[in-house]
Amino acid sequence: MTTIKPMLAHKLDKTRIDWDKPVYMQPKLDGVRCLIQYEVFPISQGGARIVAYSRTGKEFMNVDHIKNDLVHLFEACPWIVLDGELYNHNLRDNFEKIISLVRKQKPTYEDRAEARIWMQYHVYDYTGKDYGSFEGLGYRDRLDNLTCSDMYTPSVCYVESKRVKSMKAANDFHARTLAKGYEGSILRTDTPYKHGRSFGLMKFKDFSDKEATIIGYDVGQGKRTGTLGKFVMQDDDGVEFGCPPGKGYNYKDLANILNNIEEYIGKRATFTYFERTKTGSYRHPLFKTLRNYE
């Protein structure tokens, strides 16, 4: 399968913004990045079909309801590659629920039924298999095409995009998205789609995501006796730190983690933090999930 490397965001750099040109803001979704395209395989591999995959090229197998909704789009535009997020704002405080649906590689009938209820695809950009033909297409034109598209359904969602003309307007938008429960905001400039990091895509975020390795744990105390208290993690620079579970984990979840702790030790995990300390550690780190879905 020929996969596309998605455009990735830099942290906000105000010097990269030209306010004389179009600038757009979108809510930042705390979901799983997903690209969807039409691909022709050998008959022995099932022939032509729509595929959904992660930014590292891992195919998602529990999103048939989304792919079915996009059949008409890919019949008309087989060259397009949609870029978006597997997300549901009703699960904004339960990231692990999204992950549990996404990581199913051999979904059962019940898994697919649950995915139809909860899993949405939020589309915020697109590119094409023939990247060269998109070299001069800025985000304003791509956004116009997304806005006018008839592909949207209850499972395929349009991501709100608003043009802003000043840093104050961008900050106001960011404050509103936080108030609505989003994890941050994305700022887009009117630049072509780029595979890899691009200053055409910058993120406003009070908390940052990072990966580290779980090397140990502490058990819960008091009311949390019998559950996980926190993980002990080590980042790629060798910094060790305690990392308690974040939002979305209840008593039963934490007890289950403790009972199966060997499945976590040595694994890569995503955590959030507010900022780095002067000694290089992390302020307010919180465990999100194992990094085993991409």
Show the residue positions of the predicted features:
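Short, solvent-exposed polar/charged micro-motifs at secondary-structure junctions
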Residues: 34-35, 91-98, 133-134, 166-175, ...
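Covalent nucleotidyltransferase
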Residues: 16-152, 293
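Short, structured patches in soluble enzyme cores that scaffold and shape functional sites
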Residues: 84-86, 123-128, 160-163, 189-191, ...
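N-terminal, charged amphipathic alpha-helical interaction modules
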Residues: 156-158
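Charged, flexible boundary elements
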Residues: 1-20, 25
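Classical nucleotidyltransferase
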Residues: 26, 32-79, 84, 197-294
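Short helix-to-loop capping/linker segments positioned immediately adjacent to catalytic or ligand/cofactor-binding
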Residues: 109-112, 131-134, 160-177, 220-222
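Amphipathic alpha-helical
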Residues: 160-208
